[in-house]
Amino acid sequence: MSYIQFESGREKDKARQELREAREAMLQQAKERAELRGQRERQKELRGEADWMLPALAKKLEKPAKKSKKNVSKHKSRSKSKSSKKSRKHRNSSSSSESSTSSSSSFSEDEKERKRRKKKSKRSRKESASEDEWVEAPPPLAADNVTKKEPPQRDDWMTSESLLLKTFSRERKEPAKPNEKAQQIDAYDPAKSGRELNPYWKSNGTGLPGFQKPQDDDERQAKPHSSSSAQGSSRGWRKPGAKAPSPPRRSRSRSKSATSSDEEEEEAVQQPKSRPSCLTDEQINELAGKAIKAELKGKKELAAELNQQLEAARKERAEFIASGESVRNANTRPAKSKASAEHVLLTKVDQSGNVRPLVQSGDPNESYGGRMGPKRGSKKVDTHVDGQRVRYFADDDRYDIKQMFEREKHATAAEVNLQYADIVSKHKNPNDDLDDIFADKVRKQISASDAEKREMQSAIREHEKLVATLDNCERCFDSAKLDKQLLVSLGDKIYLSLPWYMGLQSGHCILTTLQHVPCCTQLDEDAWEEISNFRKALTRMFAARRQDVVFYEIANKLHRRPHLSVHCIPIPASQGEMAPFYFKKAIEESEQEWCINKQLVSLRQKSLRAAIPKGLPYVWVHFGMDSGFAHVIEDEDRFPANFAQEILGGMLELNPNAWRKPRKEANPIGKVKSFAENWKKFDCTQN
């Protein structure tokens, strides 16, 4: 006997109404939080705190821009000087050609005078350049003591015009005789000639037909000649009933495209002009100060103009506050998005983290099918001849030993696992063991074009993932998401910044690379050396305050390409002695009992890059510059992301929410300024 359970409709409606009210309340709370967040951001922008940066860093960033401008100006000045020298030479040559035929003696004297002038100018430049050495000029000689030297007279044979060679003559060239045939060709008039076949030359025509006003239905009436000729000439072997397919008419699409382009132009013309940029509080105060100064100095016109600008800025500020936009959206103009083809070098990352370009086949026909490409049938290759093994794989004859070694070395673990899964999944005989499965698969030839296509598709996917991570990275120096008001010091490859949240201790800072690098084992030598210099400076700075320092880095899930970040946390000197024991015990108990790699690696006598192989995930802790520990992460999913923070928090007896749910810093600019004052004396980037 089955019992039917009835439900009341009122209870169902009541539950639905409660669910709707709960959803509306959640949406209202989220909306209020978003509005409050937007108001805070707008207030920061109005105060000028959104783009604030330390003045020392701003100057350092402005220097390369100034250097580039100076180089451009130097290049322009050099090109101008070269052109002026060329023009002078040209003038000298033209003046010498226009001058009359002078004697060789006068020419040689002019040359000597020019050389003397050059020597005098060089001497004067040297004397002006050397400021330390100077000598008083001798007093001018009396006019009586100066004896005038007569110029030397040359012999007659040196100045005789009969012996001189003529370099040019003043005689004009006789004009060439006119060519009779050329005159006849030039004198031909097609309008008067009776042999002219062009009818538009008759009756004083121009040789071209007159202008005819186009009609509106010209495009509809016009038909391509190719279609008419194709319709007229029918094939003899075809049936008479079959008609050739007529091409689709494109007149409507053309007219639509023309009208759409005209509408776009009209919209572009009718768009209102962009509003002037909204000024911040500091800029408005500066403008008001300039206006007051102009009034005090008695410059009435300038004061009136500045007052007008001030009133306009205040009006625009009121409109901006009423509109609810952000300063960046108001100042920036909408950029036109144009889809352009992008050429990218596809790369491949192996197990050790080395990046190599994707190698493609030399034959372009292998990547296409059809007659030019390889046949689809799977050919079997003989591995044994007369009972002796000749080859192991189907492509052994294609590659030599060096190429085979490179292919095996560059292959990744994911490709090997994929190949193994492919072999096992396609095998049908369950009675065969593993050796039989691989022996049958090896005898079949695998298409090289299919393998290359698979590699190219995987490389394209990896490149798309890399572009997405770079766009969303918050630590890359060129990224728009980087909060530059937290920067403290800037080096050649490394920069020092503070976290956006409240750290475990006052003085918590982060060392990061300018470029996107996943971990310290994949760094270049100069970048690693710069990190060690920053660590030494930070250790000295906190030692002056009687504090010890703990540096740590957790390089986990490297396939996601995280950005390198080495955290620096100061701790009291009394608890700094116990920190190595806490971390040693925690690292030994972090993984399972049986591990492939060594559980604890000491860094007292060797560096991190020599202790940990390239490409493996790891955690690294260093206590000042003396000693440290490293550990290779076995299970990446189970390893905690805040491993070092948990140990330090437990050692310092802090609240767990300090690292589990960190709170945002209320006054980041004040924190940056106080840290920068302590960092000035120990800054390693100023040398």
Curated annotation (Swiss-Prot):
Region (Disordered): 24-281, 355-383
One record GO biological process: mRNA splicing, via spliceosome
Stretches with biased composition (Basic residues): 66-92, 114-125
Name the UniProt record assigns to this protein: CWF19-like protein 2 homolog
Keywords: Coiled coil, Phosphoprotein
Basic and acidic residues compositional bias, start-end: 24-50, 146-157, 168-180
Coiled-coil intervals: 6-51, 108-131, 290-325, 444-475
Pfam families named among the record's database cross-references: CwfJ_C_1, CwfJ_C_2
Domain of life: Eukaryota
Entries under InterPro entries matching the protein: Cwf19-like (IPR040194), Cwf19-like_C_dom-1 (IPR006768), Cwf19-like_C_dom-2 (IPR006767), HIT-like_sf (IPR036265)
Species assigned in the record: Drosophila melanogaster
Modified residues annotated as Phosphoserine in this record: S128, S130
Biased composition (Low complexity): 93-107
Family assignment from sequence similarity: Belongs to the CWF19 family.
